[in-house]
């Protein structure tokens, strides 16, 4: 378990997943530093509210810094002197990455290199990297297993996350930095970004506005409750990667392993909200994949990972949360 004396630095700590991981760390007594640049990819007001929520759980130190700003990043890490680094900061989003490929490469690849270099220089004991199910691309081999070696991402975002994984492996190989990569599958829950499907669909259905659907609605996603993801991250913090060929590096899927079609998701939301969705049908978008489906056998066996919240229950919880914060949503 994370002890009170263990120093943990979490990048992207003001974000959706990061703020939940921060709360989990504080509940376990970690000495926590949160690093975030509070950028405007979506309203910084959301991120500040996330930080306030974390502060209600426990005390932490906040470091406003950009992982692309090497001098500021060095200053932040030298101040924190972490034993463990959890790297969740990233430029997110499949569709925007196709429009801004250089920015995604700069942040998700260059920023990760900057952080790994600082971890090497400061002799950090463990590096946990938040990756994505998107690295699997449009594979027909299901469920998606960590054993799959031919990964063909179909978006710039996915390619940058896979590049991040490869950099993690390289640093583990060259410098014996114990590293764990966690591939997150379609995470949802309170504080979800406003542009993500469940948040966006809920807001539009509640308001009686058209819900844009890309494709025929048959695309399936392995929706995973955010606290289940946070529990998986905690298990990774506790775990020492088993060296393969002398390299202390491992990859784990964190998902629910129960993919649901888009049409089924909308039907669930309609029942929970009590309103019918007004659908606006569009052609499929570049970068989207037909299915995500996590094989979580390895995470269950090695990390003790056990997703606990089924989709119906998670959506009910999400809608309750949304209704409590809807006026802040409108203001943002």
Q: What is each model feature region?
A:
Residues 1-187, 317, 325, 331-332:
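N-terminal Rossmann-like NAD(P)+-binding domain of SDR-like oxidoreductases, especially those catalyzing
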Residues 24, 65, 205-332:
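C-terminal substrate-binding subdomain of Rossmann-fold SDR/epimerase-dehydratase oxidoreductases
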Residues 44, 48-51, 165, 199, ...:
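Short, surface-exposed alpha-helical segments at coil->helix boundaries
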Residues 44-45, 74, 98, 194-195, ...:
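Conserved strand-to-helix beginnings and helix N-cap segments that scaffold or border functional pockets
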Residues 72, 103, 110, 149, ...:
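Residue-level recognition of oxygen-bearing side chains
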Residues 142-143, 194-202:
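A glycine/serine/threonine-rich, flexible loop-to-helix segment
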Residues 163, 167, 171, 201, ...:
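Hydrophobic alpha-helix immediately C-terminal to the catalytic Tyr-X-X-X-Lys motif of short-chain
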């Amino acid at each position: 378990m994370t002890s009170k004396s263990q120093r943990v630095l979490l990048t992207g700590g003001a974000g959706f997943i990061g703020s939940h991981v921060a709360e989990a760390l504080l509940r376990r007594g970690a000495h926590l530093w949160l690093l975030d640049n509070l950028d405007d990819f979506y309203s910084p007001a959301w991120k500040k509210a996330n930080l306030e929520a974390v502060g209600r759980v426990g005390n932490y130190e906040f470091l406003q810094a950009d992982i692309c700003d090497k001098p500021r990043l060095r200053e932040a890490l030298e101040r924190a002197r972490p034993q463990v680094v959890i790297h969740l900061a990233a430029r997110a989003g499949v569709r925007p990455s196709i429009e801004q490929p250089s920015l995604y490469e700069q942040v998700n690849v260059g920023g990760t290199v900057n952080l790994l270099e600082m971890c090497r220089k400061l002799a950090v004991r463990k590096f946990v990297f938040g990756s994505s199910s998107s690295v699997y691309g449009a594979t027909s081999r299901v469920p998606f297993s960590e054993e799959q070696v031919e990964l063909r991402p179909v978006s710039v975002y996915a390619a940058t996350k896979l590049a991040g994984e490869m950099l993690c492996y390289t640093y583990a190989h060259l410098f014996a930095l114990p590293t764990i990569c966690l591939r997150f599958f379609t995470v949802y829950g309170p504080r979800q970004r406003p542009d993500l499907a469940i948040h966006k669909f809920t807001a539009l259905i509640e308001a009686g506005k058209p819900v844009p659907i890309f494709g025929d609605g048959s695309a399936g996603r392995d929706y995973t409750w955010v606290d289940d993801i946070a529990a998986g991250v905690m298990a990774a913090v506790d775990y020492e990667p088993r060296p393969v060929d002398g390299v202390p590096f491992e990859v784990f899927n964190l998902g629910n392993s129960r993919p649901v079609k888009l049409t089924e998701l909308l039907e669930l939301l309609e029942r929970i909200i009590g309103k019918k969705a007004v659908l606006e049908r569009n052609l499929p978008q570049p970068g989207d994949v037909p299915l995500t489906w996590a094989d979580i056998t390895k995470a269950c066996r090695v990390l003790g990972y056990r997703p606990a919240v089924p989709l119906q229950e998670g959506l009910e919880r999400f809608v309750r949360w949304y209704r409590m914060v809807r006026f802040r949503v409108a203001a943002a």
